[in-house]
């Protein structure tokens, strides 16, 4: 999908959602259908990496409002897109894989980008694959960016969690994404 013109693919996205909803309706008692419906209702085709999807899953499990994804922020350095954010709070989350920083100038460009975004009054939190290995700790870190009064009233979306799994157990046990990791892995390398 085109993040600059998301309306161009909205009909296709709606069609796919309806197809999946019909498929789930045919199997109402099958294990995992309720969770699949919850995921389908919150899914987006605009996440650009597995890490972005995993972080988005975590913020949704925590009960935070649905973040905007691939959101443009205009700065004196130009227009930059953040992976996900809450515009009303001016909080942005960036999911960073190692491939993003192959050359020294990549790191410098990213620093200028973040400086520009922060100069517009935004708080930027960077998340790596290693952070997602302990979603409980990462979740606590993310929540510190939000007003404590709001955090106190969040309702966890338990329907997005795998039955019997806990965030405290780490990504391997907390989500289906983690189930695909090789045993003993310290993290992903995108």
What are these regions (language model features)?
Residues 1:
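Metal-dependent nuclease catalytic cores that hydrolyze phosphodiester bonds in DNA/RNA
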Residues 4, 8-190:
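Surface segments flanking catalytic/ligand-binding clefts of nucleic-acid enzymes
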